[in-house]
Amino acid sequence: MISRGFGVIGVLAMQWALSTSAETLWSAKPFSSEGFTGGIEGPACDRDGSVFCVGFGDPRNIARVTPDGRAERFVALPEGSAGNGIRFDRSGRMYVADYTAHKIHRIDPVTREVIQVVHEPRMNQPNDLAIAANGTLYASDPNWKDSTGQLWRIDTQGKAHREAESMGTTNGIEVSPDGKRLYVNESIQRRIWVFDILGDGSLEHRRIFKEFPDYGFDGMRCDVDGNLYVTRHGKGTVVKLSPNAEILREIDVLGPNPSNLCFGGADGCTVYVTEAHAKRLVSFRVDRPGLEWSRWKAAR
């Protein structure tokens, strides 16, 4: 999250992509109309192909856009809350970072019941989430005023552990496909760090994975091969990095301020990007499916 505003809900105009063979890879197109909603952030796809995002007309609201193009308010977080990053576990439960209330919520996909997983007053504002295969959560926690940040681990019992402090503005976060590495970026400092994940989920051996000379970062996600897709806030692109930090390609996303992304679609090869300037979703097709999508397939 770089900036937020909450505008009027726009009219959704959507074309669902079903096959890579009929489409050009790496070419973004509008997935919703401009002005769909202000404050758009935190996209995630469920196993049925619906796209979820926060800020649907109100900071408490989470939107669901179904494969047939219908947009609805899926659920509202409690009073005083504001959602940001969304993730799903392998059983289909949704987790949402609540950056104003210093909480992380779990939402039942059937009953839509909102359950508090953790409330940690020491958090600045939990921003984005990553989830390991065993359900361990990791949360970035920036302090935008001071350009600093923290990093948290939430174990499967719901206990929060501060894994790192005195970092830069921690933002995008992701676990590698083999579960051995955690990536976290610093938006203002333009660095991506990587940690080793130990057997208990704790982190060690922090080192620089990649640095850029310009523009900021926001959300990021891995594909099944461990390539890291990173939003370049201010540049209007998503950059694809290999597991060795090589720049493989950069995709224009039709607006200057991409805030986050996720993989979905029928084959896991559609990337959905929340673009904050035009307040809309855009999408593009890729050659390999996303990590979370592959977990859905394995869990069926």
Question: In which residue ranges do the predicted regions lie?
Answer:
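Beta-propeller fold detector
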Residues: P30, E72-A76, I115-H119, R162-E165, ...
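A short loop-to-beta-strand structural motif that recurs across blades of beta-propeller domains
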Residues: N61-A63, K103-H105, Q150-W152, R191-W193, ...
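Beta-rich, blade/repeat-based domains predominating
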Residues: E34-V51, P78-M94, D98, K103, ...
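A short helix->beta-strand "capping" segment at the edge of beta-propeller domains
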Residues: A22-T37, R206
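Short loop/turn segments that connect beta-strands within beta-propeller blades
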Residues: V65-R70, D108-R112, I154-G158, I197-D200, ...
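Blade-level signature of beta-propeller repeat domains, shared across WD40, Kelch, NHL, RCC1
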Residues: N260-R300
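Beta-propeller domains
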Residues: C53-E72
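A detector of repeated loop/turn-to-beta-strand junctions in beta-rich toroidal repeat architectures
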Residues: P59, A101, S147-T148, Q189, ...
